[in-house]
Structures are given as structure tokens and as C-alpha cells.
Amino acid sequence: MLGSLLLLAPLAGAAVIGSRSNNTEPCPGYKVSNVREGVNSLTADLSLAGKPCNTYGTDLKDLKLLVEYQTERPDERLHVMIYDANEQVYQVPESVVPRVEGRKGARPHSALKFTYEEEPFSFTVTRDDEVLFDTSASNLIFQSQYLNLRTWLPEDPYLYGLGEHTDSLRLPTTNYTRTIWNRDSYGVPQNSNLYGAHPVYYDHRGESGTHGVFLLNSNGMDIRIDKTEDGQQYLEYNTLGGVFDFYFFTGSTPKETSMEYSKIVGLPAMQSYWSFGLHQCRYGYRDVYQVAEVVYNYSKAGIPLETMWTDIDYMNARKVFTLDPERFPLPKMRELVDYLHKHDQKYIVMVDPAVSAVDNEAYEHGVDQGIFLQQQNGSLYKGAVWPGVTVYPDWFHPDIQEYWNSEFSAFFSADDGVDIDGLWIDMNEAANFCTWPCADPEQYAIDNDLPPAPPAVRPSNPRPLPGFPDSFQPSSSKRAVKRAGGSKGAKVGLPGRNLVDPPYKIQNAAGSISNKTINTDIIHAGEGYAEYDTHNLYGTMMSSASRGAMLNRRPDVRPLIITRSTFAGAGSHVGHWLGDNLSQWDQYRISISQIVAFASMFQVPMVGADVCGFGGNTTEELCARWAALGAFYTFYRNHNEIGSTSQEFYQWPTVADSARKAIEIRYKLLDYIYTAFHKQTETGEPFLQPMFYLYPEDENTFANDVQFFYGDALLVSPVLTEGSTSVDAYFPDDIFYDWYTGAPVRGHGAKKTLENIDVTHIPLHVRGGNIIPVRSSGAMTTKELRNKSFELIIAPGLDGTASGSLYLDDGDSLEQKGTAEIKFEYRRGKLSVKGSFGRSAAGVKVQAVKVLGQKAESRMSAFRSTEFELTRPMEISLQ
């Protein structure tokens, strides 16, 4: 049975030796020959140094080594690649992850240096004589379906990254395995592989600096962090294939190290101003009337709602690119969208990759174009998800973009479709409910009631919705009711591999690598890549195609796309929500380390968790705390699942109060957020940051994953436990100011207990040395907000100075015709304003300047004074 699922092409074209063996003796490693060194590069041949061990496949006899010094001081990057001599082994396609160019470094002058031992081959990367990476811990193994490499680490290292996971920000250092294999992972459990693949880690060494190590490899892998029996610390890669394609990068600070990573995987995409507003969604809104009622209720409660979302409920029998004709009929949907747009609000729906294989145009179009995944016998590959039996788009197919554009243009037409403003893509790991080998998806769908039965049809809305069209009112009102292994140099994978049951078993929480996903023996169209190698790319390729389709609809507008599955570099296309979390306090807490890791270390800065939790029933207290914490994510969305307690912010008085207060702060800060986010899209400098990014020599910050910096200026210290009204917040050796009172807090590198924190309140402190431009007040929509004047909050540092910046543009255009970039400096009691003042600053004024930590003197009659603040009304034009 198994044999029929394998690729059994001969191995004649590959430089391999023997077959799988039970030999448990150490593998021989490789020896170096034919070394050629240049000013900025090194190449060499590697040949097997002895008898093959064939532990989890066949040892490859001949390899190549490439070393490139890609950049110069102070921010340096070293590229080290070990690959097969014939270049048959799969490599991540450049069409998915474009390669960074560079041989600008010079080996004699580089702080990063590569050295090697000839036999058995090992290599070391050093930074100014400090060892960063040392593979002498074990011999290199490079087999047809297994790669192994181990590096020594310093004692008790501070390691971060290797996402996606819900473990601590600082990774455990003993008996810890990070499995990277994207999967549908409801409840986002700890110690488990989740939705995304980010094989990059950061090693922070305090005063000596920070460096990162990125392995550009999309195969499934286990990365182990542990100690040997004699206590030596190591990190070990165990991958199911691909090549060792390493990038070592460093900066003078942790922040600059993250910036260097952005040069490798790509800068994040800039988002529209409105995308930073509040978003509301739920799986289980029964019809368009209920969606409209939620919009109305937010307005009635005085809680600003920027964007309304609809989950899979809007579809006809859960089929993508369809509408339920009775519960979400097109005329009503168009009225809903028109209403939102007239009120300066936005609308987003969800699209899954899986297309129903039963009676729908998207399926017929895809079959006609041949763009769905196929079995090796040419038949369509089928799985089972929400609509029942499904097929899956092949993102490698040369015509896939044309197909995706066409479906988007028709269904989301502004003229006669659902005119969405953004997009949510889900289930794109890809998810498959059917257990491998899923021999009969049709029967599985029947046995599991897929698609599920929809709710009963309501002929009209049961309650009046003032301001909505007549068709949204109760019936009593005036209304009308209604392919195989590659050749030499192809880089698509060796022939003859077992693509569904590899000898080495990664610790995939779902079991078999084909379980609950697309079968890994599928061969993609085009170049002939195997799903075995490209599985972790599926979601990111959908992201890229979806961005293309949204730009095809509106070429001049930045598309907001939020995805579940990601790979390294996904931030250049999309934002990410953290998946199907639970309404639990531990998941509220762990979301902090998740958003910080994605934004600062993985360069996916548009990120947030489902506020109040997706699965299970939230509580009033948890939701109130989460409404406040979520206001300090970059992506701020309330979302929960069908059958759970309704958790829109207006459902409880305390939650509504918490949300109003938090959104007021967020909206005042929105241009500060927008400015810092824009900077990350230009330079890679992170917006959301762990504490050690700003205090890299303070060891007390290294493992702190319950506080974070919102930009450089704002420290967020949420209450962490149920029933508590206090939090032990750490303050580094610096000056901070209470956001609410302006009171100075002199940090001394110790924790301070903040007490009497109301459930509607979140502790915030402004870091000294910063100037924050804020809007004079909040607003119900971001469009209204943009008409508000500015105030400047000046928080003098220990030296009495402060600085800040403000970026302004039209908020939406992909290419800007006029921008303003303004710098503020405060020294010796004087404020200077400099910069480029484009037309985006027209009509924008600063109406007041607030200096924190100051008290008025009798001669300062022009200032309004509180105990710890001085505010000077004024008018500064930013034109």
C-alpha cells in the first residue's frame, strides 16, 4: 500500500551512496578540498570522509560550500551555504523568497569571520574573536531525507525566535525541541508546532552584542536546544531535506540586528491608516441583519468601530466566492457595505484556499484552467474542510495569479459584487479535516456533516436599526421582505524519496506530516516541486497571490491582508493574526511575547491576537483587560467562535468602558503608531519591541515577556492575573512618566508594584527622552481623527533633552504624491521643528505642547499646570 505513494524514480542522477542502514556508528562527516578564497567569498568542495552511515536516508557523496561576506561594518551579514554538487536537492524558490544580493564585505576587515576545519569538516563563525556558531560539536550529516548540524552555544544562552510558537519569549535551554511544520492548531497549545515557519533565532549576549542566524529552508524540521551529558550547551538542526542555507547577521544593538534580518527576507508592507482602527468579527453571525446590528450597537455604545468583518458564515454552504442567498443575499450585502462606506467605515470578509468540488463556478473555472493540485496519476487531489469535499489551488501553477485575480474581480466587484476594503485568508497551512491518507473524502464529509447546516432563515431583522436602510428594519416597518524528481541543476528535489513517510520523524503534533493537511507526495505544476518540500510555503504563497489579486482590483491602494499561515518574509505581503486562541488568562499573557516576536524578530509588524479569545467563553474581567491590552497590538480585532458567549465590547459595561478608554488612547497615538510603522517598512527598525531591545545591557530585561515597548517611547505593563488590581512592573535605570498623570517614575533597575489598577485601566509609562505627537482627542472613525489637531508630549530624559518624529501622508495610496516627515527636538527648554513639509501636512497644526515632570512657576502664566505637567497652548502650522 505504501509503495504506491512513493516516488520510485531511480537514483542514478544523484550523487548518493548505498541505501538506508541501521548502522548506529557516528557518521563520517565530510572533508574539504579545492578551496578558493577571494576578498569577499570562499568556495570549496566537500566529499564524504568515510563509510556512509545512511541513518535516515542515503548520504550524499559530494557537496559544495559557498561563503559570502555580504555587507560591511557596522551591520554585517555572512552567507554560508552547503548544498549538493549536482544541485538537484530542493532549494527554496527565489520566486517565493528573493535572495538578497551582496558581496560588498571584505573578509580581512569584517567583524564576522568564517573559519573551517578540513577533516572532518566543521566551521566557525566569529564576531571580533567571539565564537557565535561552532559546528565542531558533531559531524555534518547530509542525506537524501535528513540533514543534521549542531552548534555549540555559550552557557545559559538568551535565545529567541524559531516561530511560530506560544512558548516563552526567551527559549528554554534544556530538553527543548522546536518543530517547524505549519499546521492547523486550534487552541495554540504550548510546546507545539503552530501555523507559521520562521527558522531564525536571535542570540543576545548583553554587552558583547546580538546576532541572528537564519536557515533558509522550508522543509519540516526539529531544532533542538539542550545540553550534553557533560553540560555543554548546543543547538541542533534536524531537517527532512533541503540544503543548509545560513545567513548570520549582526548589528550594534538588538534592534539593528532585526533591521539586518529585514534586508534578508524583505521589508514589511506599509498599511493604510484605517487598518490601525478597531476591527470586529465573529464566527457565527447568522445573517446580514446580525452583522448590521453589531455595527449599530457599537455606534450606540460610543465605541469606535473602524472595520466590520464577516467569517465563513456569509458563504453559501461554506463555498468560497459565494454568498448564502437567503442569509447574506447580494443586494443586502451591497447595502451593508454602502452603509459602512458612507459612515467612513470598512468591510472585510474571509477567504479560504480550499475550493468546494461540488457545483460552483470557482471550481469549474479552476478545473478549466487546470490550476488545482493533482495526484501523480493526474486526478484532482481532494480533501475535506468546511464546504465538504474540496480541491486546493496550486500556487506554483503558472496561471494561478490570473485565476485568483479573476475570482476576486468578479466576486468582490465594486460595481456588482461585495466591495471589500481588506481581506482575511485562513486555513492556509493548508488545513484538511480528513485524516491521512483520506482515501474517501466524500464519505468523510458525509460522516462529519460537512458543510454544517446553516441557521434558520430570518425574514427580517427582529429589532429596529436606526440609520440603516428600510430593508434592515423589522417587518412592521416600510420595507420589502426578501510532477517527479529533478535533473542536475534543477533544485527541485532528489528522486526516489519517500515523500509521505520519511525515515526521520519530526515531532509534528498532528502526527504524520501528511495528516490534517495536503498530502506531501503531491507534485506541483510548473517546476515540479514536491509538497514535501514546499508545505511551509503554502500560506505565504497564497498571501502573495491574494495581495496581487487585491492590487488588481485597486492598483493604487495599499491592501490590508491578514493571514493565518506564514513563512519567513511574509510581512512583505501581509499581516498576521495569531490564530485560534482560547479565552484564557494564560493566552492573554502569552500574546505579549507572540506579538513582540512577530513584529520585532520575524518582521511581520501587523500582528495581533483575537482579543478576548476565540475559543471558549470569556469573562467580563478577562475581556476588559484584553480590550485594553489589544489596543496596544498593531492589529486590533475582537473575534470569537460560534457557540461561545458573545463578546463584542458593548456586551458588558466594564468592557465597554475599558474599550472606550483604551481606544481613546490608541487613536490619540495613531499617528505615533503610523510613523513608527512606516519607519519599519522603510528601514526594518521594529515598532513593537521587547524590553531588552531598548536596554540591551540590562540582564533583568532579557527574559521579560510580560511588558513591552510600543515604539521607543511607551512602556506597556498590563495586569497579568485574574482578580488582581496590581502588577509588578520592571523599570530600567532611566526616567519614565506616568501616561495619565505625568508623574515621573525614576527607574533603578528594579520592579515597582503598581497598585489599585482598575479593570478598565492599563498601566502606561512614557520613556524619558521622547516627544510623542498625539491627536488632541479621539474620534469615532480614523477619517474623523485625521481632522484633529496635534499636541506634543515632551518627556525629558535624564539629560533634559527629548526628540521625536511625525510622518504624514494621505493614509491609503500605494504610491504617495506628497508626504511630510517632521523632526522635533527639545533642548534647554526650547523646542525646534524641522523636516520636509509636503502637502499631506496641509491644514495640520500643533495646538499645544505638554512637558511632563514639570511644575509651573509664577512667571509661567502662559502654561496650564497640573501637579506633574505643564501645557502651553499654541498654534504651530506643519505646512
From Swiss-Prot:
GO terms for cellular component: extracellular region. It is an enzyme of class 3 (hydrolase). It comes from the Eukaryota. The active site is at 426 (nucleophile), 429, 580 (proton donor). Residues 451-467 have a biased composition (Pro residues). PROSITE patterns: GLYCOSYL_HYDROL_F31_1 (PS00129). It is found in: Secreted. Residues 1-14 form the signal peptide. Keywords: Carbohydrate metabolism, Cell wall biogenesis/degradation, Glycoprotein, Glycosidase, Hydrolase, Polysaccharide degradation, Secreted, Signal. Disulfide bonds: none annotated. One of its GO terms (biological process) is cell wall organization. PANTHER family: ALPHA-GLUCOSIDASE, ALPHA_BETA-GLUCOSIDASE AGDC-RELATED. Glucosidase involved in the degradation of cellulosic biomass. Has both alpha- and beta-glucosidase activity. This is Probable alpha/beta-glucosidase agdC. It comes from Aspergillus terreus (strain NIH 2624 / FGSC A1156).
